[in-house]
Swiss-Prot record:
Catalytic activity as recorded in UniProt: UMP + ATP = UDP + ADP
Gene Ontology MF annotations: ATP binding; UMP kinase activity
Binding of UMP, residues: G57, D77, T138, G139, N140, P141, F142, C143, T144, T145
NCBIfam families: pyrH_bact (TIGR02075)
One Gene Ontology cellular component: cytosol
Region Involved in allosteric activation by GTP: start-end pairs: 23-28
UniProt gene name: pyrH
Top EC category: transferase
Subcellular location: Cytoplasm
Name of this protein: Uridylate kinase
One GO BP annotation of this record: 'de novo' CTP biosynthetic process
Described function: Catalyzes the reversible phosphorylation of UMP to UDP.
Gene source species: Shewanella putrefaciens (strain CN-32 / ATCC BAA-453)
InterPro entries named in the record: AceGlu_kinase-like_sf, Asp/Glu/Uridylate_kinase, Uridylate_kinase, Uridylate_kinase_bac
Length: 245
């Protein structure tokens, strides 16, 4: 375990799954989970970390099932994008209530609701200590919020994409189904592909690999895990170009 008192990263892109925001509710947003995440983000801001956030929309809407039932995929994806805006509004409000300056930017114009995404302005806001929430994915159908997280992370020149999930890292198998599944502390991009490990969709993962963007998978439901990741402590699974031996 590292005893480094200084943060390992200075600018991050935090990807939160929409499903994890449900907490025990089963649907929608659990206010307790939302407020806890806002407090954890506040801790990072107080450490001087520049934080960009992308939130999924699976707690409110999933277009895949409706697409299989006959709905046009583009329509379903547009609905999914709007679900991420709803989550973004909730997170911005939670941050404001925690006395954290935050700005919500959408990849699709929503005048009067949030700002349009602007790369240069986003970086300026991050440098000034504001949290920037990126909503509506990439603005294009057929692109996941994982792709949006990697894209925004690359654009804002983040040092790492932190992917918050419901498990505490990457395992050799599904730990929920296989108690013998082994957790990896660190992997290379090539090992992920060779072992066919599920981290994120291939388009998002390839984008991160091609731009040498590290990905760190951790359990967003574990209190204090986010801070531990930032401080370089043993938490989650780090994926990067080459393992350090």
């Amino acid at each position: 375990m590292s005893t480094n008192p200084k943060p390992t990263f200075r600018r991050i892109l935090l990807k939160l799954s929409g499903e994890a925001l449900m907490g025990e509710e089963g649907f929608g947003i659990d206010p307790k989970v939302l407020d806890r995440m806002a407090q954890e983000v506040k801790e990072l801001v107080e450490l001087g970390i520049q934080v960009g956030v992308v939130i999924g929309g699976g707690n409110l809407f999933r277009g895949e099932g409706l697409a299989k039932a006959g709905m046009n995929r583009v329509v379903g994806d547009h609905m999914g994008m709007l679900a991420t805006v709803m989550n973004g509004l909730a997170m911005r409000d939670a941050l404001h209530r925690a006395y954290v300056n935050a700005r919500l930017m959408s990849a699709i114009p929503l005048k009067g609701v949030c700002d349009d995404y602007n790369w240069a302005e986003a970086i300026s806001l991050l440098k000034s200590g504001r949290v920037v929430i990126f909503a509506a994915g990439t603005g294009n159908p057929f692109c996941t919020t994982d792709s949006a997280a990697c894209l925004r992370g690359i654009e804002i020149e983040a040092e790492v994409v932190l992917k918050g999930t419901k498990v505490d890292g990457v395992y050799s198998d599904d730990p929920m189904k296989n108690p013998d599944a082994v957790k990896y502390d660190e992997l290379s991009y090539s090992e992920i592909l060779e072992k066919e490990l599920k981290v994120m969709d291939l388009a998002a993962f390839t984008m991160a690999r091609d731009h040498d963007m590290p990905i760190l998978v951790f359990n967003m439901n574990k209190p204090g895990a986010l801070r531990r990741v930032i401080m370089g402590e043993e938490e989650g699974t780090l994926i990067r170009a080459k393992k350090v031996i």
